[in-house]
Amino acid sequence: MDLEALRKEFEDCECGHKHDFDLEALEVAHGNLDRVAEILSAHNFPKKILMVADVNSFRVTKGLYEQLLSAGYIVELRVYDSMKVADMREVEELERELERVDGCLSVGTGSVNDICRLSSFRKDKQFAIFATAPSMDGFASDSAPI
């Protein structure tokens, strides 16, 4: 996907609002689970990261943690038993964990993605998402419905 062309399409929007996004890359393809480390490396994602998932996303991305370690990533892992609704307490906890790393990899969608996205933005850490399900339009946003 040509993100620069997409960005240019929104430069002179008739609604009068400025539309922009800070998205370096988007990879959508069957088999990307086996390429996560390769994709992150190709985009100079930091090697010292916090990987955040819930138990369901962690289960369906079996082997991702080991793949990252094998590729030389230093990975701190946070797996939630269940997260139905994101809240600021979780954001603040993740912000403390992000102080020890250089980037955050959110595995999944929904509330896990919300707290990762917002805490990464607030701590000025690089952020990547490995989406496991279709979701809303919040992937490129720096805010979250918390």
PLM regions: where:
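Glycine/threonine-rich beta-strand-loop-alpha-helix active-site module
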Residues: 86-146
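ATP/NTP phosphate-donor binding region
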Residues: 1-104
